[in-house]
């Protein structure tokens, strides 16, 4: 009974093993390379030649696959080592560039830009000071010019009034005609004079014209009334017949001339004081303007120099950013190449491993399962090239 069971077990095992062999044959035949091998084996079987040479060829092919894989492994290892070196070099370059970028940005944001803001504020402040001092200077000069013009007008009015009164005095004094003393017995006559209507008319006209002229004065308009009063006096010839009255008029003219001279002296004294004060004020403003102008020029020079430094640092930052962009692109390209090489290597290794497995399995079939292989190949031929 045990013998029967053992025999059945062996039969089942043999059937299972043969099914596995057939499955292996069909699997190999599904690949182009396996089909080519089977075609070659079938031809050898048809000729009846020994399969030793074919087995040797397959063995050599298997050995060549192993050798090629070792060479490919070595090349891949060398290439990937080069990739590692290149990627590390790119990473080092990027790290250095990023470090430099951070330093440049920190210098700009933490130092140069704040300094520029301070200098710009200082320049604006000094510009305002210069503008203010220049405005003060212009206003002071304008005020001085106005005061000078006002002074000159007053001087001219004094001079014109002096000329008018002096001329009137001359007319009064020069046109008095004295007569000789006439003694009749013990009787004595007082000196007499004549003040003609022509002279009175001339003096009246002189004062009337002068009054109109004085009415246009900007400062001493009172002269116009004075001259009108003199014109009125000159019109009364009968009053001028008295030499004493004329003398009083002359004395009044002398008094007026003296007062005008005193007024003019005071006017000139006040003008001298104003000029002195103007020169002091102007000198102070000019000094302040010069100091502010120098400070402005220095601040502008410092700002221009700082702007040059900022431009250089910004240019360096632009160059660094461009380098980071270029190196990053080169690194990505190199990384892609290395990854593609890895994939190509793995694909080639997988294909070579698959072909080597086919060769190994085929050698095993020829050595151990030649009868089954022959039958399956014959079936494939009879079935139209398909097992």
From Swiss-Prot:
Chief site of localization: other
The protein's location, in the record's own words, is: Trichocyst
Q: Which stretches of the sequence are propeptide?
A: 20-48, 184-239
How would you describe the post-translational modification of this protein? Two components are produced by post-translational processing from the precursor peptide.
| Claim: Signal is one of the keywords in the record | yes
Would you indicate the residue range of the signal peptide? 1-19
Q: Which domain of life is it from?
A: Eukaryota
Which keywords does the record carry?
Coiled coil, Signal
Q: Which GO terms describe its cellular component?
A: trichocyst
Which stretches are annotated as coiled coil? 51-163, 294-333
* Summary of the function given for this chain in its UniProt record: Structural protein that crystallize inside the trichocyst matrix.
The family annotation for this protein states:
Belongs to the TMP family.
Q: What is this protein called?
A: Trichocyst matrix protein T2-C
């Amino acid at each position: 009974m045990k013998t029967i069971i053992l025999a059945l077990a062996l039969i089942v095992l043999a059937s299972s093993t043969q099914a596995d062999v057939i499955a292996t044959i069909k699997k190999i035949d599904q690949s182009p390379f396996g089909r080519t091998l089977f075609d070659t084996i079938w031809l050898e079987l048809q000729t009846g030649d020994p399969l030793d040479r074919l087995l040797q060829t397959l063995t050599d092919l298997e050995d060549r696959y192993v050798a090629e894989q070792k060479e490919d492994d070595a090349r891949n290892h060398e290439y990937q080592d080069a990739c590692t070196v290149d990627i590390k070099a790119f990473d080092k370059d990027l790290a250095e560039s990023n470090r430099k970028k951070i330093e440049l940005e920190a210098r700009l944001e933490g130092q140069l830009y704040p300094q520029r803001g301070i200098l710009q504020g200082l320049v604006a402040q000094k510009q305002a000071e210069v503008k203010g001092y220049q405005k003060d200077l212009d206003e002071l000069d304008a005020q001085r010019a106005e005061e000078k013009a006002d002074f000159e007008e007053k001087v001219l009015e004094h001079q014109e009034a002096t000329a008018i009164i002096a001329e009137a005095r001359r007319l009064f004094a020069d046109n008095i005609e004295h007569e000789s003393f006439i003694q009749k017995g013990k009787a004595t006559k007082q000196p007499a004079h004549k003040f003609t209507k022509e002279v009175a008319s001339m003096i009246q006209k002189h004062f009337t014209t002068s009054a109109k002229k004085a009415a246009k004065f900007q400062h001493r308009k009172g002269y116009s009334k004075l001259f009108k009063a003199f014109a009125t006096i000159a019109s009364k010839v009968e009053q001028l017949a008295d030499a004493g009255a004329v003398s009083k008029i002359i004395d009044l003219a002398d008094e007026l001339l003296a007062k005008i001279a005193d007024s003019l002296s005071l006017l000139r004294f006040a003008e001298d004081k104003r000029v002195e004060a103007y020169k002091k004020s102007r000198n102070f403003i000019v000094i302040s303007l010069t100091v502010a102008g120098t400070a402005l020029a220095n601040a502008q020079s410092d700002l221009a120099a700082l702007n040059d430094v900022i431009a250089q640092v910004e240019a360096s930052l632009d160059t660094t950013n461009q380098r980071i962009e270029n190196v990053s692109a080169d690194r990505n390209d190199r990384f892609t190449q290395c990854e593609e090489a890895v994939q190509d290597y793995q694909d080639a290794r997988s294909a070579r491993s698959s072909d080597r497995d086919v060769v190994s399995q085929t050698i095993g079939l020829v050595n151990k399962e030649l009868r089954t292989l022959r039958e399956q190949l014959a079936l494939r031929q009879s079935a139209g090239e398909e097992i």
